[in-house]
Amino acid sequence: MSKPESCDENACKPFACAIQDCLIENGYNESKCTKAIDNLYKCCKQFYEENGPDAASVCCPKFNLLQLKLKQRSLGKIDAELIQSRK
């Protein structure tokens, strides 16, 4: 899990920036950015382990929401997918 170089070193900000970059590169198709999302959640998990559940980072979900997201991801595919509109 290497850090993207284009962002500041705020708590997990490089990983949040990597998600933004991935979404832009993939036409906002979240399902193509699973690895970037997982990397952010791993960073946020470490952030809370080091700073406690009451810590805050603008780049991380609140502690309880992060726990829910990690549980959901462990249960299977949960990324949003783009649905092609009919023309």
UniProtKB/Swiss-Prot annotation:
Cellular component, GO annotation: mitochondrial intermembrane space
Segments carrying motif Cx9C motif 1: 12-22
SUPFAM superfamilies xrefs: Cysteine alpha-hairpin motif
Disulphide-bridged cysteine pairs: 12-43, 22-33
Key words, A-Z: Disulfide bond, Mitochondrion, Repeat
Main localization of the protein described in the UniProt heading: mitochondrion
UniProt subcellular location: Mitochondrion intermembrane space
Entries under Gene3D superfamilies matching the protein: CytochromE C oxidase copper chaperone
Assigned protein family: Belongs to the CMC4 family.
Protein name: Cx9C motif-containing protein 4, mitochondrial
Lineage: Eukaryota, Fungi, Dikarya, Ascomycota, Saccharomycotina
